[in-house]
Regions:
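Catalytic core of membrane glycerolipid acyltransferases/transacylases, capturing the structured
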Residues: 50, 58-62, 106-162
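Residue-level detector of flexible, active-site-proximal loop/helix-junction positions
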Residues: 98, 139-141, 158, 226-228, ...
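Short, flexible loop segments at the rims of nucleotide/cofactor-binding pockets, characterized by
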Residues: 82-88, 111, 159-164, 197-198
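Non-catalytic C-terminal accessory region of glycerolipid acyltransferases
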Residues: 2, 6-7, 11-14, 166-306
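Alpha-helical membrane-targeting segments
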Residues: 44-59, 70, 74, 143-144, ...
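Generic beta-strand structural signal
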Residues: 105, 130-133, 181-183, 220
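Short, charged beta->alpha transition segments
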Residues: 90-96, 137-140, 169-176
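Membrane-anchoring hydrophobic helices of lipid-metabolizing enzymes
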Residues: 2-108, 118-120, 127-131, 298-306
Length: 306
C-alpha cells in the first residue's frame, strides 16, 4: 500500500492537527486564521507542518499574537493608540495647515507599506482631526471588533463579500460624512511594489473621486515617504503568499521607523472635472509624483474647468 503524503497525513505522522482542519473548525487564533487565508496553497503543502515554525519565527508570529490579544477587547481609538505607542513611529509632517479644521474632507494618501501607513496617518491626524474615520480591511474588525468606532470596513475576500456587508460599508460611509468627519481612504487599496529599483504605487481606484463628488467635500492629497523591508520585496517577486504572510512582520518591524507625510493643498470637489478614471489618474500623479517634488503643487484637473 502506497504511503499517502497529503497535508493531513503528514500532520498525523508529526502528531499535530492539520492547519486547514483547524481553520475549518475555528480552532485557530485570529492571527493564524488570517495567515491561513493568505497562504491557502502553502498551508496545504505536505511539508507545511515543518515549514510553519520556521516561517512563523521569521514573520514574528508570537509578537503578532501578543499584539492581537492586547487590542482584542479595546475600543477602536484605544486599540489604534496602543498600536501607535507600540510602533512609536518617527513621524515628520509637512503641510498640516492644509488639513481643514472642521467639516468633512477625504484624505487620499499613497500606500507604501501597509498597516503602518494607517498608524502613521492616525498619528498625524489625532491632534488635528481626532474625529477621523478610516477605510480599512474588514479583517481589522475580526482582530478587534471595537475598531467599528474608527474604521469603515471593506471586505477584500471575494468569497466573503455580501450585500449585507456592502450595505454596512455604505451606511458607515454616509454616517461619517453626515457627521462631518475627516475620512481617510487609500485609493490604491494595495501596497506599493518594487519595480526596477523604484517603489511603485499601484493604480488608484476612483472611490475617492466618486465620494468627493457625491458628498461635495474636498480631497486633501497626502504623500507618504516610507518603505518595507528587503525581505518583503524579495518575497513579492517569488511568492504572493509568502509576501502576504509578512503582513504583521511588516507592521512590527516599523518600530521607531521614519515616516514623512506631506499634506497637499485641498482640492475642491468642483475641480474634479472629467471622467472618473482620468481624474483619478491625475490625482494619483499629483499625490505620488508632484507632491514629492513640490509640496506647494496645485492640482491640475484632467479636463478643462468650465
Amino acid at each position: 500500500m502506497a504511503l499517502q503524503t497529503s497535508p493531513s497525513t503528514i500532520a498525523r505522522l508529526l502528531g499535530v492537527r492539520s492547519y486547514a482542519d483547524m481553520a475549518r473548525t475555528g480552532d485557530l487564533h485570529i492571527i493564524d486564521q488570517l495567515i491561513h487565508e493568505r497562504s491557502l496553497t502553502l498551508s496545504r503543502h505536505p511539508l507545511w507542518p515543518l515549514m510553519r515554525p520556521v516561517l512563523f519565527r521569521i514573520f514574528r508570529y508570537r509578537e503578532a499574537v501578543r499584539m492581537a490579544d492586547a487590542i482584542a477587547g479595546l475600543p477602536g481609538r484605544e486599540a489604534m493608540q496602543y498600536l501607535s505607542s507600540l510602533l512609536s513611529l518617527d513621524l515628520t509632517l509637512s503641510g498640516a495647515e492644509n488639513l481643514p479644521a472642521q467639516g468633512s474632507f477625504i484624505l487620499a494618501p499613497n500606500h507604501p507599506t501597509g498597516i503602518a501607513d494607517g498608524i502613521a496617518v492616525f498619528d498625524a491626524l489625532k491632534h488635528h482631526r481626532p474625529d477621523m474615520s478610516i477605510f480599512a480591511n474588514r479583517d481589522a474588525l475580526r482582530v478587534a471588533p471595537g475598531f467599528r468606532d474608527l474604521i469603515i470596513p471593506v471586505e477584500w475576500r471575494a468569497g466573503e463579500k455580501s450585500h449585507a456587508k456592502s450595505r454596512d460599508t455604505l451606511a458607515m460611509t454616509a454616517r461619517a460624512f453626515g457627521d462631518g468627519r475627516a475620512v481617510v481612504l487609500f485609493p490604491s487599496g494595495r501596497i506599493a511594489y518594487w519595480n526596477e529599483g523604484t517603489l511603485t504605487e499601484r493604480p488608484w481606484q476612483s472611490s475617492a473621486v466618486a465620494l468627493a463628488r457625491r458628498y461635495e467635500v474636498p480631497i486633501v492629497p497626502a504623500h507618504i515617504t516610507a518603505r518595507n523591508s528587503g525581505l518583503f520585496y524579495f518575497l513579492a517577486k517569488h511568492s504572493t503568499e509568502l509576501r502576504d504572510m509578512t503582513v504583521f512582520h511588516e507592521l512590527l518591524n516599523k518600530k521607531k521607523f521614519g515616516f514623512t507625510i506631506t499634506f497637499g493643498k485641498p482640492i475642491p470637489h468642483s475641480r474634479l472635472v472629467g471622467e472618473p478614471a482620468d481624474v483619478t489618474a491625475a490625482l494619483q500623479d499629483h499625490t505620488v509624483q508632484r507632491l514629492r517634488l513640490d509640496p506647494q503643487a496645485v492640482f491640475e484637473s484632467a479636463s478643462p474647468i468650465g
